[in-house]
Amino acid sequence: MTRKYGILSIVGLLFAGPALAQGKAEKGKEYFLLCQTCHGENGAGNKDLNAPRIAGQHGWYLQRQLQNFKAGVRGAHADDLYGQLMAPMAQTLPDDQAVLDVVAYVQSLK
């Protein structure tokens, strides 16, 4: 029985790897200065710009969306007008750590 729990613990840690990655909210605040232009100072969003509320959103979701915008998975289709606005904004984040940092900051907003 103990061996079974040990194996399950190891498997759990293997899949938790990306979730264990941490961003630095204080650094993310610097990146967020550009984000707040559309999403607002507190991440509440802006209906006029079709910028959704991001405060209170799950970190994994924010991370995935930013990575998809950076990679061109989102915002590349001609009909995705708002995505085309967001894609170059995500491109300003220089690397994966910057994505984690801005996500950490957004998660600090309530």
Where are these regions (language model features)?
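Sequence context surrounding c-type heme c attachment/ligation sites in exported
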Residues: 29-33, 56-59, 63
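Charged catalytic carboxylate motif
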Residues: 27, 61, 98-101
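Axial heme c-ligation environment in periplasmic c-type cytochrome domains
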Residues: 47-55, 70-101, 106-110
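Sequence/structural segment immediately N-terminal to covalent heme-attachment motifs in c-type
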Residues: 22-44
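Bacterial N-terminal signal peptides that target proteins for export
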Residues: 1-8
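N-terminal signal peptide c-region/cleavage motif recognized by signal peptidases
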Residues: 16-18
